């Protein structure tokens, strides 16, 4: 699955990079501490 970079989001010195997949059905967040979350876009 290919991911496309959406943007960088930060709040109070902590943040994540956000990506969407090629058919816009999933969103992926990669946090500064290495935590990764993938969820469905409704």
What name fits each language-model region?
Residues 1-42:
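Acidic, low-complexity, intrinsically disordered interaction modules
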């Amino acid at each position: 699955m290919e991911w496309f970079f959406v943007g960088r989001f930060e709040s109070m010195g902590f943040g994540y990079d956000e990506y969407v997949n090629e058919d816009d059905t999933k969103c992926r967040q990669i946090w500064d501490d290495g935590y990764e979350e993938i969820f469905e876009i409704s």
